[in-house]
Amino acid sequence: MKTISVIVPCYNEESTVLTFFGEAERVRRELFTPLDVDFEYLFVDDGSTDKTLELIKGLREKNDRVRFISFSRNFGKEAAMLAGMENATGDFVTMLDADLQDPPAMLRTMYDGIVDEGYDQVAARRVTRKGEPILKTIGANAFYKLIDKLSDVEMVSGA
């Protein structure tokens, strides 16, 4: 059985983390169980000040597919993403935000691109960052450039 590590960086996501998990589990059951593919959920709490970590711990108690990392303070989404990549154990690794801005169902299309089409990597790319605070956009762009320079994997901004 193959496993997909779904890395979920979280910062004050108490209003969305349970909804995200429910939708991701539905996708796993309906679209991946028939393929004999399982999920590992790796939530990375980036120093949330709300009940995000408490909710993640509750998910962990009920589901052995859930793992988590908890930061002592807010280090930023990029640090959470990196910690997730360093601790993922699946055959495939992906990242999804808990706010469901990118639907978990797109994972099936991405998986098919790797398995059926033979790609080494597949990425979804946000075409525009419209409406996002300028500092967040600058930070995200800097992260993608850094990863591009430090790794053999090309990461396009917005991916």
Give the ranges of each region predicted by the language model.
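A conserved acidic beta->alpha catalytic loop
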Residues: 42-53, 100-101
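Acidic helix N-cap motif at the loop->helix transition within catalytic regions
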Residues: 15-19, 49-58
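Residues at or immediately flanking beta-strands
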Residues: 3, 36-40, 65-68, 154
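Short beta-strand/loop segment that forms part of the nucleotide-sugar
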Residues: 8, 32-47, 69-70
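N-proximal low-complexity "stem/linker" segments adjacent to membrane-targeting elements
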Residues: 1-37
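Conserved hydrophobic residues forming the short capping helix/wall of the S-adenosyl-L-methionine
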Residues: 27-32, 56-60, 114
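Acceptor/aglycone-binding surface of glycosyltransferases and processive sugar-polymer synthases
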Residues: 58, 65, 71-73, 77-87, ...
